[in-house]
Amino acid sequence: MKAGIHPDYHPVVFEDSSTGKRFLTRSTATSERTVEWTDGNTYPLLVVDVTADSHPFWTGAQRLLDTQGRVEKFNRKYGRRVRGGQEG
């Protein structure tokens, strides 16, 4: 690899904003906010909306969508149209 063309890859703490869980990993992302980790070192802190700790795929929790409302909206917009005087 060429020297000087790659971003700095360093340890970063990510925090799930909905659960508050934090995990230490490596990333090129940076932040002005910092946090002291359990090992006594200080790392940049990035707060994110969704992680494996809160994502429905990983937690098994389901989110119900208003599919009935979407179907009705679709039918109103694109539903049965009249062609040449016949319903079709």
Swiss-Prot record:
Cellular compartments per GO CC: ribonucleoprotein complex; ribosome
Protein's recorded name: Large ribosomal subunit protein bL31B
GO MF, any single term: structural constituent of ribosome
Record keywords: Ribonucleoprotein, Ribosomal protein
Organism, scientific name: Nocardia farcinica (strain IFM 10152)
Family designation: Belongs to the bacterial ribosomal protein bL31 family. Type B subfamily.
GO biological process entries: translation
Subunit organization: Part of the 50S ribosomal subunit.
